[in-house]
């Protein structure tokens, strides 16, 4: 059984495509506000509408999952949904920032926690889509980077803790990817910083999940950056990050109020 949040677009949709191409007979569930397009009829697929920023929606969708899930078989939970924001804190607004924390942090923790007993009984894997931004503090994307840092550390610690239960946890850490992220982050158009396509990222992610690697950084340039960033003192990393982002002049892509 496969459960993916946010498989309607971006990396989640690309991962769903790879599952479709594998000709798996496993039941596949998508949790998001809108269903993905073009899912082959051969796939045992169910879309469950869910706003992951709403705890009540998560509780309801887990109850629905328990009614629909097959009685046996290993479970793969892919916590993919998430979005970001660009600008000096608290831009673009406190409510937007709190919603980001709910979707990027609370939703993965709640989904995983509510399905934990099923995972322990069945065995399987939890894959959390974090980010290269999780390796260092990132000015002008402060809260987004912090949510991804949480996902990265939480996932690695959970993997160490859960192995004895037959559960593996994988943190997938893409760098810039050509998805709808720019629009959700408040940009009027693409920033042109997409270092990988969603398909390229998904290919590496799926290979890393199959190998149960605790941390999967996609893209060789991003792997180098992750190692470099992790070794720097955090104040240095933040100062260098601020200078680099300012030089990119991302403000020119931001939607005008």
For each feature predicted by the language model, list its residue ranges.
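Substrate-binding pocket helix/loop in short-chain dehydrogenase/reductase
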Residues: 88-101
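Rossmann-fold cofactor-recognition segment
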Residues: 42-56
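Active-site helix of classical SDR
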Residues: 112, 147
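N-terminal Rossmann NAD(P)H-binding glycine-rich loop of SDR-like oxidoreductase domains
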Residues: 8, 16
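Conserved NAD(P)H cofactor-binding loop of Rossmann-fold oxidoreductase domains
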Residues: 80-85
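Residue(s) in the substrate-gating loop at a strand-loop-helix junction
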Residues: 131
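C-terminal helical subdomain
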Residues: 171, 189-226
């Amino acid at each position: 059984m496969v459960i993916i949040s946010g498989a309607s677009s971006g990396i989640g949709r690309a991962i769903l495509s790879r599952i479709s191409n594998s000709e798996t007979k496993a039941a596949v569930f998508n949790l998001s506000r809108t269903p993905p397009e073009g899912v082959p009829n051969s796939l045992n697929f169910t879309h469950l509408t869910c706003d992951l920023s709403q705890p009540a929606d998560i509780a309801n969708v887990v109850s629905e999952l328990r009614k629909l899930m097959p009685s046996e078989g290993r479970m793969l939970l892919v916590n993919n949904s998430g979005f970001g924001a660009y600008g000096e804190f608290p831009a673009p607004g406190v409510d937007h920032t709190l919603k980001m924390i709910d979707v990027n942090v609370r939703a993965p923790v709640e989904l995983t926690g509510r399905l934990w007993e099923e995972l322990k009984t069945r065995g399987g894997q939890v894959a959390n889509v974090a980010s290269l931004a999780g390796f260092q503090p990132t000015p002008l994307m402060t809260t987004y980077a912090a949510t991804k840092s949480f996902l990265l550390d939480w996932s690695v610690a959970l993997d160490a803790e859960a192995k004895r239960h037959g559960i593996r946890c994988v943190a997938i850490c893409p760098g810039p990817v050509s998805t709808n992220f720019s629009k959700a982050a408040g940009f009027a158009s693409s920033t042109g910083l997409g270092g990988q396509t969603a398909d390229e990222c998904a290919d590496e992610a799926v290979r890393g999940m199959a190998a149960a690697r605790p941390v999967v950084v996609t893209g060789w340039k991003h792997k180098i950056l992750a190692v470099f960033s992790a070794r720097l003192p955090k104040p240095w990393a933040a100062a260098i990050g601020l200078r680099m982002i300012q030089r990119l002049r991302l403000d020119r892509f931001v939607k005008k109020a």
